[in-house]
């Protein structure tokens, strides 16, 4: 199963150009609010018509502007979970699911498919309840049951945890993770949360300002985001201006000692990224080290966040260290931090 998307949609002051492919695995669309992630899902679902381009699912053309093809949503066999779940408020959970099975003309087959969806989402005891009588997590399961009952060829989840209280998210995330892992087809997860994307999806597409910045396996994208914007969106706080010296060497602005980089440094490299947990205290003069001055320390439940400045005082560095490694902040903060070559990411 495969999805091919190459579409353009223009609005006043904003243009979406989404071009990517996705296979039969869970793929995250990661980006800040307003970057075009949700609009991309709506184009795929047929809710929004692109101005240009083409969408193909398993060799079947869903949209092709040049050929005049634009299948209506009900013919695309696409399941889209909206942020607010879009359950019919005056219908029970069971009735909501049966609405998705209108194409099935055999009443017995409809009832059987509905019962299967209720069992799959553990909703048997809630079948006769209205959506307003359900918790946020139960409403989400009901919406997913309605989608899955129709057996879509692609499952799309638009910020599925945004409407949930924080204490529910971990439980619901586990359920969604199991669903994505067991879904036999293409699944797209829209999120602005890099941790959710990393935990739930094997593939990742990073979007910014209507454009795809980076695509690949989730681990590849985190290890080598390639651009400063993609690095920030994947959570890298330390993005340091530099100049390219050689294929594996850069100079940081205002610091004479070169840094060795394991990844090839592209010609257009203008910065390096170092994730906060990839620093380690070191002695002055250690290769790939930076002299630092402590600014502040803050405590989280399981780790410490320390902020330093580089010489000159304008550039800040974030260092995150687990409490298993460091039970308490040292009386004297380290004067030097180092990063291994494999943990330095060249960025354009």
Which residues fall in each region the model found?
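ABC ATPase nucleotide-binding domain helices that frame the ATP-binding cleft
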Residues: 38-41, 141-142
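The short alpha-helix immediately C-terminal to the Walker A/P-loop
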Residues: 42-43, 203
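Catalytic "switch" loops of ABC-type ATPases
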Residues: 47, 78, 82-88, 193
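ABC ATPase nucleotide-binding domains
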Residues: 77, 92-229
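C-terminal boundary and immediately downstream tail of ABC-type ATPase nucleotide-binding domains
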Residues: 223-246, 273
């Amino acid at each position: 199963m495969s999805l091919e998307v190459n579409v353009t949609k223009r609005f006043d002051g904003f243009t979406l150009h989404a071009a990517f492919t996705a296979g039969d695995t869970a793929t995250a669309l990661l980006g800040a609010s307003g970057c075009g992630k949700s609009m991309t899902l709506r184009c795929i679902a047929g809710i929004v018509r692109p101005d240009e381009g083409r969408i193909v699912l398993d060799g079947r053309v869903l949209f092709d502007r040049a050929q005049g093809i634009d299948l209506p949503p009900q013919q695309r066999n696409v399941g889209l979970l909206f942020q607010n779940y879009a359950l019919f408020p005056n219908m029970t959970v069971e009735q909501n699911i049966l609405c998705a099975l209108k194409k099935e003309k055999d009443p017995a087959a409809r009832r059987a498919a509905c019962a299967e969806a209720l069992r799959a989402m553990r909703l048997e005891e809630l079948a006769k309840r209205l959506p307003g009588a359900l918790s946020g997590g139960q409403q989400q399961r009901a919406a997913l049951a309605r989608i899955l009952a129709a057996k879509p060829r692609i499952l799309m989840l638009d910020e599925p945890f945004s409407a949930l209280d924080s204490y529910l998210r971990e439980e619901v995330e586990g359920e969604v993770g199991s669903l994505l892992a067991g879904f036999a087809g293409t699944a797209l997860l829209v999120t602005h949360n890099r941790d959710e994307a990393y935990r739930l999806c094997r593939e990742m597409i990073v979007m910014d300002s209507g454009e795809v910045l980076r695509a690949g396996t989730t681990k590849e994208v985190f290890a080598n985001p390639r651009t400063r914007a993609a690095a920030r969106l994947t959570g890298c706080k330390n993005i340091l201006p530099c100049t390219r010296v050689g294929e594996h060497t850069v100079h940081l602005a205002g610091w004479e000692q070169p840094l060795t980089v394991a990844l090839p440094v592209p010609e257009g490299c203008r910065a390096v990224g170092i994730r906060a947990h990839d620093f380690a205290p070191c002695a002055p003069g250690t290769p790939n080290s930076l002299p630092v001055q402590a600014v502040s320390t803050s405590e989280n439940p399981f780790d410490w966040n320390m902020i330093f400045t580089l010489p000159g005082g304008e550039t800040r560095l974030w260092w995150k260290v687990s409490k298993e490694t460091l039970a308490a902040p040292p009386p004297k903060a380290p004067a030097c931090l180092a990063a291994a070559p494999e943990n330095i990411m060249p960025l354009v």
